From Swiss-Prot:
Pfam families in the record: Ribosomal_L11, Ribosomal_L11_N
Subunit composition and interactions: Part of the ribosomal stalk of the 50S ribosomal subunit. Interacts with L10 and the large rRNA to form the base of the stalk. L10 forms an elongated spine to which L12 dimers bind in a sequential fashion forming a multimeric L10(L12)X complex.
GO annotation, biological process: translation
Organism, as annotated: Nitratidesulfovibrio vulgaris (strain ATCC 29579 / DSM 644 / CCUG 34227 / NCIMB 8303 / VKM B-1760 / Hildenborough) (Desulfovibrio vulgaris)
This protein's name: Large ribosomal subunit protein uL11
A GO term for molecular function: structural constituent of ribosome
Alphabetized UniProt keyword annotations: Methylation, Ribonucleoprotein, Ribosomal protein, RNA-binding, rRNA-binding
Family per record: Belongs to the universal ribosomal protein uL11 family.
Length: 140
């Protein structure tokens, strides 16, 4: 018989750097999970992506056990890394803060493909281009 799901918790945590402090501790603690066990498992699984913001969906079961799925980093984080920026523009329609090449956009779209609802790579590229536009990043 399958375990009974009690809750799903969605968090964005830096890869390889989960610790019991907020937001991880309070989110898991209210469901009675072993916070350190999650932190150790998450850090071991994401060690090769160290520093990247990694979305994670934690499924909590009735017996206080858990499982989790890591997703690809948000497109905005990947674009900021590709453009070598600190953050996006506060006024994207007026101030362009950086630029990325179409090849970089294609690379990001290919990486994000499993988590996007896009049917093909072209649709995924359009999705990434829209994110870049809303952040004030120019595509060349």
């Amino acid at each position: 018989m399958a375990k009974k799901e009690v809750a799903k918790i969605k968090l964005q945590i830096p890869a390889g750097a989960a610790n019991p402090s907020p937001p991880v501790g309070p989110a898991l603690g209210q469901h009675g999970l072993n916070i350190m066990a999650f932190c150790k498992e998450f850090n071991a699984k994401t060690m090769e992506q160290k520093g990247m913001i990694t979305p994670v969906v934690i499924t909590v079961y009735a017996d206080r056990s858990f499982s989790f799925i890591t997703k690809t980093p948000p497109a905005s984080v990947l674009l900021i890394k590709a453009a070598k920026l600190e953050k996006g523009s506060g006024e994207p329609n007026r101030n362009k803060v950086g630029s990325v090449t179409m090849a970089q956009v294609e690379e990001i779209a290919a990486l994000k493909m499993p988590d996007l609802t896009a049917k093909d790579l072209e649709a995924a590229k359009r999705n990434i281009l829209g994110t870049a536009r809303s952040m004030g990043i120019e595509v060349k």
